[in-house]
């Protein structure tokens, strides 16, 4: 998503290898002819200079290609989600490892995330060589209380739930009183719906499988989910998703529409049997649940996803030499003191951009405005990466990608799209729109008590549906179409 410029070398590697090698051979032949019978000093000097020049060019080109391919191999083609189910004891408990707690009674959630818990229990059985004694609890607060009052000696819990507990009244310090004695990983295959062109007109259908798409297919419309996490943990680990953006990408009209959905949107999850939850909590159960939940909300089929780590995203921005971001308001940051942002253009380094994307308390519209600012930062990165000056920062940007984002978009699809861009040229139009709602206090599916949520404004949801449909069908939108 960092633009075609970031991926240009990969496309050159696949599409222009012949030209690259042919030019190299011709250049070497020229050097040979100049030096072969170097009776004249000037001809010999020219030959030597050209030899040094071609070595430098070939070395630099090879380095650019290597860095690009290496980066793409790292971030593309991801097909699994990892859920970490951890075993926790109180900080002062004598148990240091799982075997030390073999005689304990373990607290577990009776329904929430039960499939992952059961798989973790099976792993514990194989490791301990005996059955695990458990007590079941209906909610997070009951589970936490069981450990605090000694009813259980340890608890088995998806680590992503610790952030949820931190949000709950009377449990904000609970996670700091725990010690992890075992970590069990449960892997889930990430499903994707691959667009397939059915006619020359570019109309598409979806197939739900994990096969690689034909690299020659470029006349497609992609619907891509961008999940933004704010953590320094592993990218593949399931966690709450604080950024939820849907990209509708029409490669024929060169138009990209970004739809932001607030993290606190109170909607049924695909696994909650109709019980509403905060959208951010969908990420606890894996990226499949986040995508399926948004599919239900907007009546769409998401093809692929990008998972973006905003805590590491600052590395990319610093590698780019900073970005220019348009702010709707002049404000001082509240979460992190000491940062001031002007209305209009702001040139930001990585740390400043991270503060900008995190801020919500400085705005009357809170999380709504934060979603718009997150899209503005993504737009700033795209704008900077498509400028010619980007090439001087290219290698440092490639080095910064690892650990910042991942995607299940296959390598060949990205290379195919880049080759088309190189062949046809032309600029892309990027527009954004945010779904809205009304603040309320409700009990979410994943929590044991009431919390702040946002009740969806169906009018804005319907408008988002219409906008995405128009982009998919090839209509060119204007700024007026996405105005709030």
Task: List where the protein language model places each region.
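N-terminal secretory targeting and juxtamembrane "stalk" segments of secreted and cell-surface proteins
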Residues: 34, 38, 44-47
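Hydrophobic alpha-helical transmembrane segments in integral membrane proteins
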Residues: 59-77
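Juxtamembrane transmembrane-helix termini
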Residues: 36-40, 67-70
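Membrane-embedded alpha-helical segments of integral membrane proteins
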Residues: 1-35
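Non-catalytic, solvent-exposed segments at the cell envelope interface
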Residues: 76-80, 88-91, 97, 105-112, ...
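Internal/C-terminal transmembrane anchor helices
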Residues: 43-64
């Amino acid at each position: 998503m960092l633009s075609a410029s970031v991926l240009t070398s990969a496309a050159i590697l696949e599409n222009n290898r012949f030209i690259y090698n042919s030019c190299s051979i011709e250049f070497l032949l020229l050097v040979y002819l100049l030096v072969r019978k170097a009776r004249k000093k000037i001809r010999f000097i020219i030959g030597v200079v050209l030899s040094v020049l071609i070595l430098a060019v070939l070395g630099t080109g090879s380095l650019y290609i290597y860095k690009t391919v290496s980066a793409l191999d790292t971030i593309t083609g991801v097909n699994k989600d990892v859920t970490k189910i951890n075993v926790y004891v109180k900080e002062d408990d004598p148990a240091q490892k799982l075997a030390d707690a073999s005689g304990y009674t373990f607290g577990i959630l009776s329904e929430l995330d039960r499939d992952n818990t059961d798989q973790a229990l099976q792993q514990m059985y194989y490791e301990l060589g005996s059955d695990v004694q458990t007590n079941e609890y209906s909610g997070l607060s009951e589970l936490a209380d069981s450990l605090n009052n000694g009813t259980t000696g340890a608890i088995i819990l998806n680590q992503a739930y610790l952030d949820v507990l931190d949000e709950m009244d009377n449990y904000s310090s609970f996670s700091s009183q725990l010690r992890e004695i075992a970590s069990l990983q449960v892997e889930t295959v990430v499903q994707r719906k691959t667009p397939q062109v059915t006619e020359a007109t570019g109309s598409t259908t979806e197939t739900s499988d994990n096969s690689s798409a034909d690299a020659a297919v470029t006349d497609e419309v992609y619907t891509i989910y961008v999940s933004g996490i704010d953590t320094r943990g592993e990218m593949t680990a399931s966690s709450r998703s604080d950024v939820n953006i849907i990209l509708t990408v029409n490669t024929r009209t060169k138009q990209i529409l970004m739809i932001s959905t607030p993290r606190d949107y109170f909607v049924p999850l695909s696994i909650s049997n109709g019980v509403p939850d905060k959208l951010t909590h969908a990420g606890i159960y894996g990226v499949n649940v986040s995508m399926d939940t948004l599919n239900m909300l907007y009546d769409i089929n998401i093809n692929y996803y990008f998972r973006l780590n905003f805590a590491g995203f600052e590395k990319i921005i610093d590698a780019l030499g900073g970005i220019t971001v348009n702010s709707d308001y002049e404000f001082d940051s509240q979460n992190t003191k000491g940062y001031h942002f002007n209305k209009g253009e702001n040139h930001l380094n990585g740390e400043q951009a991270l503060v900008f994307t995190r801020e919500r308390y400085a705005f009357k519209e809170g999380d709504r405005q934060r979603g718009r600012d997150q899209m503005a930062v993504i737009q700033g990165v795209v704008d900077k990466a498509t400028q010619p000056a980007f090439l001087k920062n290219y290698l440092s940007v490639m080095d910064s990608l690892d650990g910042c984002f991942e995607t299940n978009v296959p390598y060949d699809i990205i290379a195919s799209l880049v080759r088309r861009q190189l062949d046809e040229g032309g600029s892309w139009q990027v527009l954004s729109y945010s779904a809205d709602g009304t603040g309320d206090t409700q009990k979410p599916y994943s929590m044991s008590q009431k919390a702040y949520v946002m009740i969806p404004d169906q009018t804005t949801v319907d408008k988002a549906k219409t906008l995405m449909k128009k982009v998919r069908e090839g209509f060119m939108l204007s700024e007026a179409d996405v105005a709030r």
